[in-house]
Amino acid sequence: MDSWNMKGSKMVDVNEITKYLPGFNCGACGYKRCDLFAEALLNKDVKLEDCPFLLRERFKENYEKLKEILKIKGKIKKEEKYIGVIDGYEADFLLKPLPNECSCRETLLIMDKKELKVGDYIRYRPLGCPIPHFAKIIDEYHGFYIIHVVGPSHRITGEKIEYKDVGIAIVVAFEGIVEGKVPEVGKTVKFIPKHCMMQKVHSGVVVQVEGKRVYIEGIDLKVF
């Protein structure tokens, strides 16, 4: 669906351009991904013809559509800024849960020797965070636990759930959907998990990207 500003003028953003590109992320245009090429098109740093696939018969309609879109001048949609509430730092993007999930997936290193299994509910405090968390274990992998944060909202609803207290845990990874510009693999990024109670900026290194789905390791709350 096309976007319009308050005066009825058409808005153009990276997503509108990207959906008409071939989507091969082949790098032939000089950019690693099609969305990066789309951004360069909007900034007029490249030409459509720099993508060799757009010149093929298969993508003829896409090529013509993109030419029409790129005729719109001076209406490029500005990227939204994501600012942490606690420290006021600017994040690169907001990290949202995977479809039909209640929170981003987090991978924990739990030092407590309690016997834990998938389906258990745990109470813990992430290293460096002053707020106790409540979570459900959804998977286990080589001594790491993948969880969904589910509380402390249960204290408001009055829901009675038995939790195992495991003390301090180290958050080693996040997985979720990017709202904003998708980062490249290997980049150090600053992000805000949408479910974070403090809305604090986190940092980490992107190790996997699939569309807008990203996996980030080396999580740290110290951001400069």
Swiss-Prot record:
Note on cofactor: Binds 1 [4Fe-4S] cluster.
4Fe-4S domain location: 9-68
Pfam family for this entry, one: FeS
Family annotation (InterPro entries): 4Fe-4S_dom, ACDS_complex_subunit, Dihydropteroate_synth-like_sf
Molecular-function GO terms, alphabetical: 4 iron, 4 sulfur cluster binding; metal ion binding
Swiss-Prot/TrEMBL cofactor(s): [4Fe-4S] cluster
Chain sites annotated for binding [4Fe-4S] cluster: 26, 29, 34, 51
Keywords from the UniProt entry: 4Fe-4S, Iron, Iron-sulfur, Metal-binding
Protein name: Uncharacterized protein MJ0119
Organism: Methanocaldococcus jannaschii (strain ATCC 43067 / DSM 2661 / JAL-1 / JCM 10045 / NBRC 100440) (Methanococcus jannaschii)
